[in-house]
């Protein structure tokens, strides 16, 4: 356990940041699942809506540092391929 006040604050801040990052990554996973379910159901309208929301969540996670830039690009690419399955 830290004894120095600034280190105690840093521990609190690290924990707060960890929770924020986990929340953002969890949102990305959730919207990814929702997109897959909409595509599996064949619902084009819902899939498009889920896709847009997913891209927004990914961009936000990258912007805040919860996801690396390349990881965000990879997830967006995968999402686009999943959405493209509706066209077949």
Predicted regions and their residues:
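Ribosome large-subunit tunnel/peptidyl-transferase-proximal elements
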Residues: 2-88
């Amino acid at each position: 356990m830290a004894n120095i006040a600034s280190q105690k604050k840093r521990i609190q801040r690290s924990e707060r940041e960890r929770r924020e990052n986990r929340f953002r990554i969890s949102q990305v996973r959730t919207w990814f699942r929702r997109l897959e379910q909409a595509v599996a159901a064949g619902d084009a309208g819902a899939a498009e809506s889920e896709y847009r929301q997913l891209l927004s969540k990914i961009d936000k996670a990258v912007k805040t540092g919860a996801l690396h830039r390349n990881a965000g690009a990879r997830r967006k690419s995968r999402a686009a391929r999943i959405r493209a399955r509706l066209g077949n």
